[in-house]
Amino acid sequence: MKKFIVSVVLALVFSWQFTGSLFAGVPLNNLEGVGGVAFNPLAYLANAGSKWKKDEPADPTKTEPAKKGGFNDFGLLSKVSKPQAGAWYVRLPESHVDWTALGTAFSLYDRVEFSYGWEAVAPHGGQTIYKNNIGSKLLLIPENLGDHNFIPAVSLGGILKNTTTTPTGTKHVGFDTYLVATKLIKETPLPVLLSGGLLATNSRTTGVFGYDHNYRFTWFGNADLILLKNLAAGYEYKQGAKFHGWHDADYQDVHAAWFINDKLTLVGAWVYAGKAKGTKEVGLGDGFTVSLHYAL
C-alpha cells in the first residue's frame, strides 16, 4: 500500500548540461505556474539563464556613435529572461477529479521571477472550479555565493490566488507567502537536488475549496536524483494546513523527468493526496499526472 504521490513535476533535476550556470533554473512550472516542482516552489528563478538579448562588449575598433531610438537603449532586453511554460494533467480516480493546469514564468535581472498559473478542477458530475494564480519570487541569496559551494539559493515568494466558486464561509481570494532554500549537490556519485521551505497559507486544498480567514504555517520539501544526463527521479512532500474545522491531507509524489533537450521536458508521476473518503482530513486520493514543459 505504497501511496507515494508522484506529483506533477519532476522537480528540479536539470541535467548536467544545466548545472554549470549560477542562476540556472529548473525548466519546470508547478501547478500554480511558479518555477518549481508539482506542489512546491524552488528557490531558483524561471529560465534565468536565458536572455532575449545578451550584453555585448564594446568594440574598441569602432568609432561610430551608438544608434539611438532602439528598444534596447537602456539594456532592457539583456535583463529579461525568455519565458518558460508548463501544461499539467492530473487524474485522481478515487475522488473522480480531472485537474488541468497551465503556467508560465519569466525573470528580471536574475533576481525576480513573475509567474501566472491557470487551473481547472473538474469533479465528475459537478461544477468545474477555475483558479488563477499570480506569483512573484525574489532571489535573496544566489547559490554558491562568494564561491562557497555549501551556500544554497534562498528565495522569498508570494502567490495571489482567486477561485471562481468557493464553499459558503470561505473567501474567493487568498495569498500565500513562502521562504525556500534549494541546493544542487554535485560532490556525490550522482548529482542530488535538495529543496525545502516554509509556507504561510490560508488556502484550503491549495485554494480549490476557497480560502480560510486565518493563516497556518506548513513546510515542504523535495529530493531529486539526476540518474543520467537527461533523466531524473525524485520525491516531493507538502504538509497539509490544519484550519479550524478543516484539515488538509499531506501531499506526496514520486516522479520521473525526461529532459528531451535543453528546451523540452516530459514529466510523469504518481500522486497521493490523502484518503479520498477520510473523516479526519480532506484528501483527494491517489492518481497519476503527466506534464510537458517548454523553455524558450
Which role does the model predict for each range below?
Residues 14-22:
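C-terminal segment of classical bacterial N-terminal signal peptides
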Residues 208-213, 217-296:
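Outer membrane beta-barrel transmembrane domains
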Residues 1-8:
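Bacterial N-terminal signal peptides that target proteins for export
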